[in-house]
Amino acid sequence: MSDKKELLWQSRFSEPFDRDALRFSSSVHIDKALFREDIEGSIAHVTMLAEQDIISDAECADLVQGLREIEEELASGTLVPHWEDEDIHTVIENRLKEKIGQTAGKIHSGRSRNDQVATDTRLYLRKKIAELQDAVQAMQQMLIGKAETYKETIIFGYTHLQRAQPISAGHYYLAWFSMFRRDRERLRDLLRRVNISPLGAAAFAGSTLPLNPARTAELLAFDDIFSNSIDAVSDRDILIEFISACSIMMMHLSRFAEDLILWSSYEFGYLEISDAFATGSSLMPQKKNADIAELVRGKTGRVYGNLVSMLTIMKGLPLSYNRDMQEDKQPLFDTAETTISSMRIFTKLIGHTTLKVERLRSLTSEDLSLATEIAEYLVSRNLPFREAHRITGKIVTFSIGEGITLPRITLEQFRTFSPLFDSAIYDSLKPEASVNSKKSHGSCSFRSVEAQLAEARAQMQENR
């Protein structure tokens, strides 16, 4: 660190800061990712200072020009932050001083690094929320396409990882659509709390200068300004909320990934993953592995860990600002990039999967998953459900014992369990008839899936 590069807080101290302590406390290797947001916030701040006659218009022009040049230098890599600079704010201010001299010191009038970094973080979050919403929207469009393609393909629905009832594959894909819709809603709701400017709170108690926080909020396209200067700089709940929303989103992706991994296995054989999204084995030449799905499933743990990390960092901190909060950047940045990249690659993966329709047709036509239809058939004949359930259980036991599937049980055999059976039972034991017999709202029938598709398309139009 050259003699010209003084730490921003160093003037009060008679001894230089220990180099090992500086290296330990330096965050520039992480927070350099905020250089655009930092410069954007600084330009808004000095513009407001000039409008409030705290600095001159000429000084403002010099500051803005210098900041724009530094932004280009950082973007191009001609200005490389060093750990001795402590943080990205110091990098920018020191470089500004080299460019325009002592006027650079006026950039911090009425501002602390506390409200500065809080502003940077909110600007960053706003951008990442927009990117993530776009990624989720692309996933939803993909799911609508899959649901349209496979709306009349019958697959097994599962509970406890056991075949439960036949359903439309379109119904399955639209279930994920609904989950990701709530994920988008969480982000949209969070944005209301993120898009509030903390700039003007200073260190935590405000400033004696005639600042205009509403003006900087306007310049930075914030919807509102802080109401309490302590709160503005001392909480990180919006970061925790963002990581929490991402954790839920990654949980959805992880569950979806698990289905793809299982369904693409030889044991299930329901689905084929394109070679472009599968890998092999360095030893076993026959292998085709669902590695992308497995990686998304694994990365979910990273995001969960980031959530616990943030909650632990903030646990028990006294008001207002504490240096512990410097540790918020790594979990935030990692969560944003991991979730966005996972959503994007998983959307592409879904586009490179194909259901094995003929195999599914063969499997669903000869399976015990039609047992519920027998119970509901008896209920439609005015038998109490509990009795219908008991009788159907006996029929299933008989089917397994005789080694025959439910549709192959003769009417005479059915009637040994209940005289209510007639030839109409066989209509219920066809997978397509089973699916289309569902009359309740949001069910798996082809008609219901078509209505759900129309609703999904309408929602996507509204959210554009």
Curated annotation (Swiss-Prot):
Keywords: Amino-acid biosynthesis, Arginine biosynthesis, Cytoplasm, Lyase. Pathway: Amino-acid biosynthesis; L-arginine biosynthesis; L-arginine from L-ornithine and carbamoyl phosphate: step 3/3. The keyword Transmembrane does not apply. GO terms for molecular function: argininosuccinate lyase activity. One of its GO terms (biological process) is L-arginine biosynthetic process. InterPro entries: Arg_succ_lyase_C, Argininosuccinate_lyase, Fumarase/histidase_N, Fumarate_lyase_CS, Fumarate_lyase_fam, Fumarate_lyase_N, L-Aspartase-like. Its EC number is 4.3.2.1. The lineage of its organism: Bacteria, Pseudomonadati, Chlorobiota, Chlorobiia, Chlorobiales. The gene is argH. Pfam families: ASL_C2 (PF14698), Lyase_1 (PF00206). Its main location: cytoplasm. PROSITE patterns: FUMARATE_LYASES (PS00163). It catalyses: 2-(N(omega)-L-arginino)succinate = fumarate + L-arginine. It comes from the Bacteria. It is found in: Cytoplasm. CDD domains: Argininosuccinate_lyase. It comes from Chlorobium phaeobacteroides (strain DSM 266 / SMG 266 / 2430). It is an enzyme of class 4 (lyase). Belongs to the lyase 1 family. Argininosuccinate lyase subfamily. This is Argininosuccinate lyase. GO terms for cellular component: cytosol.
